[in-house]
């Protein structure tokens, strides 16, 4: 059995760890609330953009736009596919990073002709260690997502797409289903699919006059980049929220384990202390008996 000093040292060490896990839990909780508010504050604007795009497509379903081209004339093997992969800058977030990287790895194996745009230090280290080429100039943090960062990311990707250097772009991120469930998703970012914009006209729908100047194509090409920014921003915030939520759950589990260990160590300490006291009493009694025998002699 360990002595009381060793047990006290272990108790102190676990208490120090418990303070850290509790602090990390509180920090992640605060960041989660902040990120949810950021998303809710900007959602109305981007939902309006989506609604306007649906409205234009409802009136002009055959509109010509580079953002809606299908690339059906190209073989799948010839298409250059871009993947935006959103991971975390830090660990201690349960299976959050593992799930994203696993899905990304599966997609890369399906499409050898790809470009990889990785957000988050852990993701960059993961692919670099495995010798998988990533875009070196694409270097963004995922901490505290901002619209400006989403705009910069979107502009880089859109420019490559418009130049024809990318035929398709997908984004891999994590969405929050509820407080205890997250889901890793892959969504096609470019080209857009008209079917995703609910352009079917209801039977009793009265077609209104729609004036788009200088032309429907120009208006659409102006709206789409902002819509892409909104999509990327939403994915960044969702992923950041999931990271914080996963870290909260990991820290909660770690704190529970630490408390269980402290409970067991308290019992061990009390037993060791009791054994030590018993040993001391036994030694005192034995010593007293020995002295008594000496006096009789």
Where are these regions (language model features)?
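C-terminal beta-strand-loop-alpha-helix "lid" module of Rossmann-like NAD(P)-dependent dehydrogenases
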Residues: 1-297
């Amino acid at each position: 059995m360990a002595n009381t000093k060793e047990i006290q040292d272990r108790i102190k060490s676990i208490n120090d760890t418990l303070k850290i896990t509790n602090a990390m839990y509180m920090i992640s909780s605060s960041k989660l609330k902040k990120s949810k508010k950021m998303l809710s504050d900007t959602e109305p604007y981007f939902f309006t953009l989506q609604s306007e795009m649906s409205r234009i497509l409802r009136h002009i379903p055959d509109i010509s736009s580079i953002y809606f081209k299908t690339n059906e004339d190209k073989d799948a093997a010839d298409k250059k596919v871009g993947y935006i992969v959103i991971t975390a800058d830090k660990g201690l977030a349960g299976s959050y990073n593992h799930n994203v990287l696993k899905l990304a790895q599966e997609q890369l194996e399906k499409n050898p002709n790809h470009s990889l745009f990785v957000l988050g230090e852990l993701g960059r280290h993961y692919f670099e260690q495995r010798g998988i080429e990533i875009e070196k100039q694409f270097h963004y943090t995922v901490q505290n997502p901002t619209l400006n960062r989403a705009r910069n990311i979107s502009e880089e990707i859109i420019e490559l797409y418009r130049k024809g250097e990318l035929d398709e772009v997908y984004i891999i991120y994590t969405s929050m289903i509820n407080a205890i469930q997250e889901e890793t998703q892959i969504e096609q970012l470019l080209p857009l699919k008209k079917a995703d914009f609910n352009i079917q006209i209801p039977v009793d729908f009265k077609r209104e006059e729609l004036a788009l100047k200088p032309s429907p194509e120009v208006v659409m090409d102006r709206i789409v980049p902002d819509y892409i920014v909104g999509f990327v921003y939403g994915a960044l915030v969702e992923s950041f929220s999931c990271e914080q939520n996963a870290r909260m759950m990991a820290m909660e589990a770690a704190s529970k384990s630490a408390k269980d260990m402290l409970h067991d160590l308290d019992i061990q300490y009390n037993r060791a202390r009791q054994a030590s006291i018993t040993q001391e009493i036994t030694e005192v009694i034995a010593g007293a008996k020995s002295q008594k025998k000496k006096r009789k002699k």
